């Protein structure tokens, strides 16, 4: 702020030393330095406030410019897309209003009617599937009534197969028993063999 060189400071120091003397010169220097610091602080505050005001003014101008912009300043493609979206939305609203006016109902009532129609359609589909299943079951029972001999033959064949399986199981079990008895006779302990002649002699 104060563009003072070394020579100017030296000149001021000599003048102060001559005028004030060596005793009051240090006090005067401290007082002057305090004033200089205060003045510099005030100047810095003023500069900061001015800078903030300028920034605020620039920001306000930018906001005003942004508010002044409209769809005409946009690109033609974007403006066309926005117009098409608006037109389609208005058309859908007009169709709903027209349908509601023809049936003397509101939009919510129209939605409720559509939901009821969907529920009715689903119930009809369920009833149709039940009818088809019932008709298939009836047809199968009719076929069984018309050809009972075929059904009885199938049942008899199943019974014969089961009986054949049981006979095979019995034969296999008997064969296992015979083999087991043969092995027991073959590997009988010698004591039993020795006792058998003695018993025969006693009997004779």
Swiss-Prot record:
It is found in: Cell inner membrane. Its main location: membrane. Residues 154-204 are annotated as: Disordered. Gene3D superfamilies: 1.20.5.3310. One of its GO terms (molecular function) is protein transmembrane transporter activity. InterPro entries: TatB. GO terms for biological process: protein transport by the Tat complex. The keyword Methyltransferase does not apply. This is Sec-independent protein translocase protein TatB. It comes from Mannheimia succiniciproducens (strain KCTC 0769BP / MBEL55E).
């Amino acid at each position: 702020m104060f563009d003072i060189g070394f020579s100017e400071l030296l000149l001021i120091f000599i003048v102060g030393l001559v005028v004030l003397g060596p005793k009051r010169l240090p006090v005067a220097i401290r007082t002057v330095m305090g004033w200089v610091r205060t003045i510099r602080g005030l100047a810095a505050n003023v500069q900061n406030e001015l800078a903030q005001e300028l920034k605020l003014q620039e920001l306000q101008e930018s906001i005003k410019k942004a508010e002044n912009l409209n769809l005409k300043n946009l690109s033609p493609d974007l403006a066309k897309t926005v117009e098409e979206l608006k037109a389609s939305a208005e058309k859908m609203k007009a169709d709903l209003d027209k349908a509601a006016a023809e049936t003397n109902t509101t939009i919510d009532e129209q939605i409720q009617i559509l939901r009821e129609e969907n529920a009715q359609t689903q119930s009809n589909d369920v009833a149709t599937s039940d009818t088809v299943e019932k008709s298939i079951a009836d047809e199968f029972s009719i076929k069984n009534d018309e050809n009972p001999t075929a059904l009885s033959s199938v049942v008899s064949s199943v019974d014969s197969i089961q009986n054949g399986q049981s006979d095979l199981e019995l034969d296999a079990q008997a064969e296992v028993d015979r083999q087991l008895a043969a092995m027991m006779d073959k590997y009988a302990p010698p004591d039993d063999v020795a006792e058998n002649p003695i018993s025969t002699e006693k009997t004779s």
